[in-house]
Amino acid sequence: MGAAYKVFGKTVQPHVLAISTFIATAAVASYFTTKPKTKNEGKNSSALSQQKSGESSNSDAMGKDDDVVKSIEGFLNDLEKDTRQDTKAN
């Protein structure tokens, strides 16, 4: 066997110590390179204040739903007109 190190009273092989050192270094580096989340916190707080004041945050989604419904109704009306014209032609 080769040399081994004693860490906190346990015998640790050199390759395990090297791998754990690389992992710890990568973890610390990634922790300090992440950007703070101050922008997201500001957005969340404004959404909470809108909900508390009674304003609906889903108003845009409801407007989009209305547009989709109108589009579907228009498509169905056009389809009915086309089928009527086809039946009259036959």
Curated annotation (Swiss-Prot):
Annotated Polar residues bias: 43-60
Pfam families: ATP19
Membrane topology: Single-pass membrane protein
Membrane-spanning ranges: 15-34
A GO CC term attached to the entry: mitochondrial membrane
Region annotation Disordered: where it falls in the sequence: 34-65
Keyword S-adenosyl-L-methionine recorded: no
Cell compartment(s), UniProt: Mitochondrion membrane
The UniProt record lists the keyword Transferase: no
GO biological process: calcium ion homeostasis; proton motive force-driven ATP synthesis
Principal location listed in the UniProt entry: mitochondrion
Entry keyword set: Glycoprotein, Membrane, Mitochondrion, Transmembrane, Transmembrane helix
Glycosylation sites: N44
PANTHER family from the UniProt entry: ATP SYNTHASE SUBUNIT K, MITOCHONDRIAL (PTHR28074:SF1)
Protein name per UniProt: Uncharacterized protein YOR020W-A
Source organism of this protein record: Saccharomyces cerevisiae (strain ATCC 204508 / S288c) (Baker's yeast)
